[in-house]
Amino acid sequence: MAADDKVAILTDDEEEQKRKYVLADPFNGICREPEPPSNETPSSTETSAIPEEEIDWIEKHCVKVNNDLLISKVFYFFFYSAYGSLYPLLPVYYKQLGMSPSQSGLLVGIRYFIEFCSAPFWGVVADRFRKGKIVLLFSLLCWVLFNLGIGFVKPATLRCLPKIPPTAHPTNVSHPVTVLPMNSSTVAFFSTPPKLLQKRDVQLSETEPNISDIDLVSTALTLTSEPTRRPQTEAITHPVTGLILNTSTVTLPPTGNVTRETTIAVVTTTKSLPSDQVTLVYDQQEVEAIFLIILVVVIIGEFFSASSVTIVDTVTLQYLGKHRDRYGLQRMWGSLGWGLAMLSVGIGIDYTHIDVLIDGKGCKPPEYRNYQIVFIVFGVLMTMALIVATQFRFRYNHFNNSDGKGKEVEIPQVERDNSTESSEETPTAATHSQAFNFWDLIKLLCSVQYGSVLFVAWFMGFGYGFVFTFLYWHLEDLNGTTTLFGVCSVLSHVSELTAYFFSHKLIELIGHIRVLYIGLACNTARYIYISYLENAWTVLPMEVLQGVTHAAIWAACISYLSAAVPPELRTSAQGILQGLHLGLGRGCGAMIGGVLVNYFGAAATFRGIGMACLVILLLFALIQWLAVPDEEEDKTMLAERIPVPSSPVPIATIDLVQQQTEDVMPRVEARLPPKKTKHQEEQEDVNKPAWGVSSSPWVTFVYALYQVKELIQLTRESRASEIQPLQVTLCWASVASAPLLPPCSSKHMGNRKTGMLAKDISGLRSLCHSVYQVA
């Protein structure tokens, strides 16, 4: 009886279709759409409605989730949680190690350059040898090992030194010490070496009768003089720094006929200075050693770990298939994890401190935060991302598309569809490539119109790199806490997500160029506002502008350039833009910004970059007004399928599935189907029995009048052009070709008897002909 069970047969057919669909295109499945209702039996709807009621909430919302995209979401969450818990705090961690702003900016900015160069390299290696999963896992392992190594670097030694103002004629340590006659001998003391106190020379004048009044913390001075003029060298030891100073030459002037040796006894005076007269200084030799060690670790670690995000982005885009515009829905989980991790770690650091050993007395111990918590959290979260990454599936079937053969033999229909689509679009792509090659792309981007947009993209990346590196540095100078840093991170990421979802609407409303105007204006206001801060917590209102100055600017630039080039060159244009904005822009912002902060201070640098934003805004507006006509701006051509990153890590720059370049084209809106008549809807409704023409002449006459009346009513409403032809025309063609039994009689005439239909076949042919003429 199983063969007679139509419901069981339907279930088997549906499972077979699903299996074929999954084998045919494993990366295009986003959600399982409901199967169309079958019209083979009236009871199918009743039987299908029963299981839907029995499906519980867990099976409906969890079982039907796409597992591949779920893995991508979880990976993005853990990876960017680890990234957000550590990397925004690295500049202030370097500051606590005793590094200068220029050194900190170099350590942060060099990552962008290495990442931009190494990520495409490892992507090509992974594709060439088909070892994407191994490269991904190795890069994530390097993330854990090399970054944890930075957290175990021992800080430089802190020394407590007196703050004695220099006199009018300071002497250096390399100058000889001259001792005048004993009645008024003056010893020109030394200054600390330049590596201990930069630009500070200390001179100590002491008279021998008042030598006990030397105002030093601890000084041991030994002088040995002879009546001759023979130079004598002595070693001067400074217990404060614990260093043995260079030897000095002591020359005694003639004191008459004195033949005996004169020896000055050792005088040691210990006296604690007030805390306002001493300062804490890092040992610069140790700081330089720490800087070189971390620099080597960063260069090696970043080279091997930079490819992880590129590979995961590429796999996620393959999972999405034709639905690449949904990349932002996957990537937003990373931004969510970033904000939550940054806030949690910031609160935890505020309640943990470490004790610092100081070489010297009189200095107040500083309040140092325990940043080892950050590295521990980073290691745990990145390890979780490494475990999740083992579940990624890597398919390299796109490399075999040129052979024209597939391993699956059950999907010929899908392969034929893809071949027909590619064959239809091949001539246009060939003509585009002949008329528009890569050098034409370079010439286009070097023009005034698009070159100015690229410069704005670079400068906005410069500003983002500077803010990412030195915003928390400046807020810490204003007594800002890591909890404040976490709140700032949450606000900025919420702003970026909001701007991401509404950026294309904003571009469509006001245009690409005006969005760039707004971004430059917001940057000007934000930087100048930050430069005049006195309370660190007042920075929060300006953090909501992060979405406009980052996400909206990126979307406008990449959409503007993508609309100007043909589809086959969009990947190249995207790579050039990413290189300028994410690589060169942010790297220069961190490194050049560090040099400026080192010489002018953080507040003055913020103010200067804000004024530079204003100048660039005016120049850019002038260029667009003079050199670019208004008709060049096409607001309708939007590259909505290109993802918008909301982090310093660039997205994939290599298009591995080049056969799907047509998927990046702006989608064509589907036309609405023509309006159907009420009778057509009733005829196509499988829940109602078939309503066909009866053998009775009265029913046939009423049926014809009803059709004519409905057609006349629709014609009066000026909708006749949008109406589908009645299905009776199909009956007319079938009747004309089959004199005995029309094929459509099974649908329109129900389960009528064949003999009755044969009697009325001639009348039905004339009826169909008349209705067809009226339609």
From Swiss-Prot:
Record-given protein name: Major facilitator superfamily domain-containing protein 6
Lipid bilayer topology: Multi-pass membrane protein
Classification via InterPro entries: MFS_assoc_dom, MFS_MFSD6, MFS_trans_sf
Organism expressing this protein natively: Mus musculus
Homology family: Belongs to the major facilitator superfamily. MFSD6 family.
Region span, Disordered: 28-47
Segments passing through the bilayer: 74-94, 106-126, 133-153, 289-309, 338-358, 372-392, 453-473, 482-502, 510-530, 547-567, 582-602, 608-628
Residues annotated with Phosphothreonine modification: 11
Keywords of this entry: Adaptive immunity, Immunity, Membrane, Phosphoprotein, Receptor, Transmembrane, Transmembrane helix
Record keyword Phosphoprotein present: yes
A GO term from the CC aspect: plasma membrane
Chain's role: MHC class I receptor.
Matches recorded under SUPFAM superfamilies: MFS general substrate transporter
GO BP annotations listed: adaptive immune response; antigen processing and presentation of exogenous peptide antigen via MHC class I
An annotated Gene Ontology molecular function: MHC class I receptor activity
Location in the cell: Membrane
Low complexity compositional bias, start-end: 38-47
CDD domains according to UniProt: MFS_MFSD6
Gene3D superfamilies according to UniProt: MFS general substrate transporter like domains
